Every structure is written in structure tokens, then in C-alpha cells.
Amino acid sequence: MRGHQIVAMDLPLEDPDAGAVRYAEAVLQALQGAGDDVVLVGHSMSGLFIPFVANQRAVRKLVYLAAGIPKVGTSVVDRVLHGNESDMFNPAHLNKDPSKDEAVAIEILFHDCKPEVAHWAISKLRHQASRVVFAEISPIQAMPDIESAYIVCTEDRTVDPAWSKRTARELLGVEAIALPSGHCPQISRPVHLAEVLTSLTK
């Protein structure tokens, strides 16, 4: 993204006890010294804790990329099993770990990548040891009162695109921006994604 400083996050994926607060702390630490003009992008699971970050420090905009959105007072598990959001995830791939099974990784994450790109991406995958962020009641007391955007990946095989569109409207009050890609456009369509993200910084 030309003209923009990019801050990459090193999340504590290997910590079996890490929940939203622990993940948010890692983001807050990475953003030390970044100033106030921050557009924070949360991909996939990261959407569940980027609002917590925005409640702790100055953030200009939140962007959810094929991401979960937290709901105050409940957990993702309860929403899926006992609420009206059973379509949040693709049920065919629940309890399958793409970091341990190359075929699963290609099927649900990198199906729209060139083979050599998919294999490179698989080599970079890290196992997410904790499921706390999905099982815990969201620690967010209130959603931050800042501008938000949602990018729905129309060929997503992990987070259901229909759920993304509906929930972006219901919880964020925005119409999702459609990106023709699978769950990981930063791998399969980086130029297109960069264009969309750049437009959202204006």
C-alpha cells in the first residue's frame, strides 16, 4: 500500500490460554508509537478483538476482512449453537486444522491461489492452539463509536459470505464491500485487496 506505513502483528497463536484480551494486548504493543491515524484491519478471527483495541487507544477506522464480529454479552460458540448464527462458519470444515493438513488448507483457505502460491502460504501457517476467543463471553463492554467497514470475500469457504453481509449490516450498520476471493485475499489477490484498503483510508 503506497504511502502507508504497515504494521504487522505477531499474535500469540501458540498460547493455549489466549483470549481476546491477550490478542488485543499484542496488537496494542505492536502499535506503540504508531500515532493516532490508524486504520486497523482484522482478518478472520482477528475481527473478534479489534474493537477491544479501539476501545483502548486511538483508531480512526476498523476494517473487518472476512472476519468475525463480536457481540457484547455472548460468545461465538453460543451464537453459533444457540443463537441464529449457525451459518457463521462453513460446517463442512469445522474441527479441521489447515495448519496440520495441506489438503484442508488448500480446500478452505487457498483454493483460489496458484499452486505455488498456495504451497508457500501453507508453509507459513501457524497452529492456533487456543479456542478461548471463540468460547469466552466477549470481554468487549461496548462497541467503539468509530467508523467501520466490512470486506466480504464472496468465494470464502471458511466464514460464510451471506452471514458476513447480514452481520455487517446488523452489528456494524454498514453494507459489506464485496471482494471476489476466498478467505485469504492477502495471499490470492493482494493487489486488489490493497486497492480496496487504500480506498478505505481516504
Report the location of each language-model feature.
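Active-site loop/oxyanion-hole signature of alpha/beta-hydrolase fold enzymes
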Residues: 5-39, 54, 77-82
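Short beta-to-alpha linker loops that shape the active-site pocket of alpha/beta-hydrolase fold enzymes
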Residues: 10-14, 68, 182
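Short, amphipathic alpha-helical "lid/cap" segments that border enzyme active or binding sites
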Residues: 24-28, 190-198
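Flexible "cap/lid" loop of the alpha/beta hydrolase fold
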Residues: 55-103, 131-138, 160, 165
